[in-house]
């Protein structure tokens, strides 16, 4: 009974071996994909007046709320809803990640690059 309760199945062990031996380089292969997405989206957003830092590597961007006092008063949750209504682009309010995220919006870079660029153009058009 102890073997059944505490050991992993042979199928799971074999799957782990395959993942570790055959797919070890897969995460590195994504580096260039996410770098291109990041750079192209940041280019569009910055050309539209967004102030964004360049993360070294991530699957998302953190976008500060515009410095406009009215927008700052709205907060990230309300402004994210506003942008969704005006642009059709869903951003995650930073406050959902804790108090340190208040005043920020998170944009996931998990869609194809062309779709992300279009989303960035729509965000720029929706901003005051």
Q: For the regions a protein language model found, what residue spans apply to each?
A:
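PLP-dependent class I/II
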Residues: 1-128
């Amino acid at each position: 009974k102890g073997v059944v309760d505490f050991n992993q199945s042979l199928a799971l062990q074999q799957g782990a071996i395959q993942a570790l031996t055959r797919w070890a380089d897969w995460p590195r292969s994504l580096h260039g994909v996410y770098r291109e997405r990041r750079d192209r989206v940041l280019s569009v957003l910055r050309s539209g007046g967004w102030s964004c830092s360049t993360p070294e590597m991530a699957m998302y961007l953190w976008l500060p709320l515009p410095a406009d006092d009215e927008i700052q008063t709205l907060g990230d949750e309300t402004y994210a809803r506003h942008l969704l209504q005006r642009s059709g682009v869903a951003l995650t309010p930073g406050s959902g990640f804790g108090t340190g995220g208040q005043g920020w919006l998170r944009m996931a870079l998990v869609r194809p690059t062309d779709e992300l660029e279009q989303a960035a153009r729509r965000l720029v058009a929706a901003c005051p």
